[in-house]
Curated annotation (Swiss-Prot):
Protein name (Swiss-Prot/TrEMBL): Phosphoenolpyruvate carboxylase
Classification of source organism: Bacteria, Bacillati, Bacillota, Bacilli, Lactobacillales
GO cellular component, one term: cytosol
Family per similarity comment: Belongs to the PEPCase type 1 family.
InterPro entries, sorted: PEP_COase, PEP_COase_bac/pln-type, PEP_COase_Lys_AS, PEPCASE_His_AS, Pyrv/PenolPyrv_kinase-like_dom
Cofactor: Mg(2+)
Location of the active site: 138, 575
Summary of the function given for this chain in its UniProt record: Forms oxaloacetate, a four-carbon dicarboxylic acid source for the tricarboxylic acid cycle.
EC supergroup of this enzyme: lyase
HAMAP family assigned to the protein according to its UniProt record, in alphabetical order: PEPcase_type1
UniProt keyword annotations, A-Z: Carbon dioxide fixation, Lyase, Magnesium
Alphabetical GO biological process terms: carbon fixation; oxaloacetate metabolic process; tricarboxylic acid cycle
Encoding gene (name): ppc
Catalytic activity: oxaloacetate + phosphate = phosphoenolpyruvate + hydrogencarbonate
Length: 912
């Protein structure tokens, strides 16, 4: 049975109606701001863009002065943002309608549970599933928090539009509120005036928890267990969705991440969940006002009641409220001990705050849960369980999911930093003076000896230490303290960027050992390798095989339930070898590494370092997960959620629920479903892919690494220099100087190609590789079509290429090419354009479609609708880049270009 994707069921008539209202209010606000004559120029640009007269559009834009350009840019940057909000509202509405009316759709949880329930080991599968979105602060969310708050207000107003139409809400008042939001939005700086600090990034991301993630996850977990129970499967310990966090712990290439930011991240996270618990307790306290005049609580509740400091005469016959008072007192004392603060949203009396020392703290979240369950059990005896279910279920689920820590913080550092620190430690401890000069075999032998036989901390001497080593040691010390204070789940992994050898992994273990986070018997934090480049992916098999064979590692895995996580980097492998090479090498690496783990009795799990775009491993989540290699999901899967993707997916509780449902359902589906195509046929497909990818890699590298004009083209014909100046993240755009390709981060690399509308990382090298394969044998086209129809990996691969071809615009890209200084550099565009045309032709052949996005009609309509508006922004951006690069006075250009970057990113809906 084929189910509908909710994204393809949106009512575009409703979206168009709302966009019409938003556009009208935007026009009125803009006209009031700039006057009729100036607004007439905006309308003229819209008409010219719609007529597709490119030269005329360029001429009219170039005639605008800088002052006019600011207002025009603001208008066209705001319009796609408003369209996005309307589309998000429609999706959220569809989620509610389909769930409330029990309609099926692709990825619906009930259908997924029904599928699993047929398995003999259904309980084990559902109990162990754990899908973890890991929120990161990579610099692709270019909108300010202030702007996001305004868009939230507009979102909520549009959610009530149906009530406006039927008269439940006053239309005039509603319209004026919407107008006010749009007027404020038009006069608010879209881009930050100063570079973000890590602390800003932490608070920005944590804002999604109270409004969306906590209610969505608790609702999802509750529903998950209810559906399992319908099949007589009781899942007491299941946490199908938990959250991860990189901000504050990811110091790879970011000098501003320190022990202090790690402490801050953990503390602020904990504050968020304590605040949630306090609010929920207040609701329970107010709601459950049962009197002993009408019922008798259990002896256990009576005991809690008597421990309460609540001496109000109005509570003497209300044992449940007295019990809640005691529970809150314990929770307040716990927060004070753990975080040094007292939440403002409490109901216990001020004088009782002075006597908290007489109230015991909760030693762990389960003690808190136990007290609540005591009350629930008592109420269940006297009432229908449906009554208590509505009061208690979500807070009890929240305790299991979020504990006192909210989300698990990942630590990450580059392998070169670890090597430097370990070399210094070994030298200062008198163990080895020339560690970095040792062979790989010698390094491994030395490191294993230290880990297995030397219990001391190598830093525990009075010898002076480098600034780098001091900084790193302080971070590990803080990690140890946080785990002791907030529980084991607050930090569970340390990721090593650029893992190129087994010694890289053992060096990480040495650093963890300095504060007893690993010892010869167990590991409190797991060492997680990150394989990023194509070469690293090829070497991963040998590295993991050797690492898992060490006796000490086998002991560590026992303390980690025999799971070993491996992180896969999509961005650098794409930048290194192109889209096909990246995807295929990642696919093969997963398949091989999973088999290695199975052979050695270890469950390999994966952390997917995806970005928002196809070029960074992005694309639709459901399809991306179901496209993973067969048997490669062993209970757990983690993936990064970055930048604007966080707002798109988790901006409100309804779309958050839906996207979490998609992630979990896809993971479970991939775990239990059988391959649609035989293993023998898949083997044939793999053989063909090896040939295609080899060709694609050659084509990609011939341009990117062998054409001497390519780098000049990239730095001149994209806004990379302008993007590097944006205040969109705490992390530098490049590890080295900006014009160094090897040090250029994948995010600005992809972001720049998106802005210039080429979308290069999402398709280059694909067309020629497929065309050459087809030309070699006419039957190959039929094989590729079979692969597209029957192999989820290949279908997802081509669908993503299709999407990015549809978002590219070669006419606009040609204008960016005009920014190049010389003709040789400009010729690079001709190479790119020829490959684009070929790729589009071949993709449509394989898909057997007449047009791009044939399987995503709503996305096609959306792009068709918004293209005329945000295409204008590209031409404005090109004009301002020309003026800015010719003019030594940069101020005005630095204020206009970021507006255009914001608008184009909003229009494309995935920037980096």
């Amino acid at each position: 049975m084929t189910f509908t994707k909710l994204e393809n069921s949106s009512d575009q008539a409703v979206v168009a109606e709302e966009v019409k209202i938003l556009t009208k209010l935007l026009n009125e606000s803009t006209r009031q701001l700039i006057g009729d004559d100036a607004f007439a120029k905006i309308q003229d640009l819209i008409d010219t863009s719609a007529s597709k007269d490119q030269k005329q559009l360029e001429s009219k834009i170039s005639s605008l002065n800088n002052r006019e350009m600011i207002v025009v840019a603001r208008y066209f940057a705001t319009l796609p943002l408003l369209i996005n909000i309307s589309e998000d509202v429609e999706l959220a509405s569809k989620v509610n309608v389909f769930n409330n009316t029990d309609q099926d759709y692709l990825g619906k949880l009930s259908d997924t549970i029904d599928l699993v329930a047929q398995k003999d080991d259904a309980k084990r599968i559902l109990e162990n599933v754990n899908v973890v979105p890991v929120l990161t602060a990579h610099p692709t969310q270019i909108q300010r928090k202030t702007v996001l708050e305004l868009t939230d207000k507009i979102h909520h107003l549009l959610r009530s539009y149906r009530d406006v139409k039927n008269g439940t809400i006053n239309q005039r008042e509603w319209t004026e509120q919407l107008r006010a939001c749009i007027e404020i939005l038009m006069q608010t700086d879209i881009i930050r005036g100063h570079k973000l600090k890590v602390s800003n990034e932490i608070t920005n991301v944590l804002a999604y928890y109270p409004k969306a993630l906590i209610p969505a996850i608790t609702k999802f977990t509750t529903r998950y267990k209810e559906l399992a129970k319908e099949h007589n499967l009781t899942l007491d310990q299941a946490t199908p969705i938990t959250m991860g966090m990189w901000i504050g712990g990811d110091r790879d290439g970011n000098p501003y991440v320190t022990a202090d930011t790690l402490e801050l991240s953990a503390t602020l996270q904990s504050q968020v969940i304590f605040e949630y618990y306090m609010k929920e307790l207040k609701k329970l306290y107010r709601a459950i006002s049962l009197s002993t005049s009408y019922m008798q609580p259990s002896a256990a509740v009576e005991k809690l009641s008597k421990l309460s400091n609540d001496d109000s005469p109005f509570r003497t016959d209300e044992p449940y409220r007295r019990a809640f008072y005691y529970i809150e007192s314990r929770l307040v004392h716990t927060e004070k001990e753990l975080l040094g603060i007292i939440d403002k949203n409490i109901f216990i009396k001020p004088h009782d705050l002075e006597n908290l020392d007489n109230i015991p703290v909760y030693n762990n979240p389960q003690e808190f849960k136990s007290d609540l369950e005591t009350i629930k059990a008592s109420l269940d005896e006297d009432h229908d369980q449906a009554v208590t279910h509505s009061f208690f279920t979500q807070i009890l689920e929240a305790i299991d999911v979020f504990g006192f820590h909210l989300a698990t913080i990942d630590m990450r550092q580059d392998s070169s930093v670890n090597e430097s620190c370990v070399a210094e430690l070994l030298k200062s401890a008198g163990i080895c003076d020339n560690y970095s000069d040792l062979s790989e075999k010698e390094k491994v032998e030395l490191l294993l000896s230290e880990l297995e036989n030397d219990p001391r901390n190598l830093h525990a001497n009075n010898k002076p230490k480098s600034e780098l080593l001091q900084k790193e040691l302080k971070i590990y010390k803080t990690a140890r303290q946080l785990k002791d204070r907030l529980g084991e789940d607050v930090i569970k992994q340390h990721i090593i960027s650029h893992t190129e050898s087994v010694s890289d992994m053992l060096e990480q273990a040495i650093m963890l050992k300095e504060y007893n986070l690993v010892d010869s018997e167990k590991a409190r934090i797991q060492v997680v390798p990150l394989f990023e480049t194509v070469e690293d992916l090829l070497n991963a098999r040998e590295i993991i095989t050797q690492y898992l064979s060490f006796p000490i590692v086998k002991k560590w895995l026992v303390s980690q339930n025999n799971y070993q996580e491996i992180m896969l980097g999509y961005s650098d492998s794409n930048k290194d070898g192109g889209y096909l090479a990246s995807c295929w090498n990642l696919y093969k690496a997963q398949k091989d590494l999973t088999a290695i783990g199975e052979k050695l009795g270890v469950k390999i799990t994966y952390m997917h370092g995806r970005g928002g775009t196809v070029g960074r491993g992005g694309g639709p989540s459901y399809e991306a997960i179901t496209a993973q290699p067969f048997k490669s999901i062993n209970d757990r899967i983690r993936m990064t959620e970055q930048g604007e993707i966080i707002q798109n997916k988790y901006g409100n509780k309804d779309t958050a629920y839906y996207n979490l449902e998609m992630l979990a359902s896809a993971a479970i589906d991939r775990m239990v479903s059988k391959q649609a195509v035989s293993e023998e046929r898949i083997t044939d497909f793999r053989s063909s892919m090896d040939k295609i990818v080899e060709e694609s890699n050659k084509i990609y590298r011939k341009l990117v690494f062998e054409n001497p004009a390519f780098l000049d083209y990239f730095f001149q014909a994209t806004p990379i220099k302008e993007i590097s100046n944006l205040n969109i993240g705490s992390r530098p755009a490049s590890r080295k100087k900006l014009t160094d390709f090897s040090g250029l981060r994948a995010i600005p690399w992809v972001f720049s190609w998106s802005q210039s509308r080429i979308m290069f990382p999402g398709w280059y090298g694909v067309g020629s590789a497929f065309a050459n394969f087809i030309n070699a044998d006419p039957t190959h086209l039929k094989e590729l079509q079979e692969m597209y129809k029957g192999w989820p990996f290949f279908h997802s691969l081509l669908s993503n290429v299709d999407m990015f071809l549809s978002k590219s615009n070669m006419e606009i890209a040609r204008e960016y090419a005009s920014l190049c200084d010389d003709e040789e550099t400009k010729k690079v565009f001709d190479i790119i354009y020829q490959e684009w045309k070929l790729t589009k032709k071949v993709i449509l052949q394989i898909e057997d479609h007449d047009d791009l996005l044939a399987e995503a009609p709503i996305l096609k309509q959306s792009l068709d609708y918004r293209m005329p508006y945000f295409n204008i922004l590209n031409y404005i951006q090109i004009e301002m880049i020309k003026r800015g690069r010719e003019d030594e006075i940069q101020g005005v250009y630095q204020s206009i270009i970021p507006i255009t970057i914001n608008g184009v990113a909003s229009g494309l809906r995935n920037s980096g």
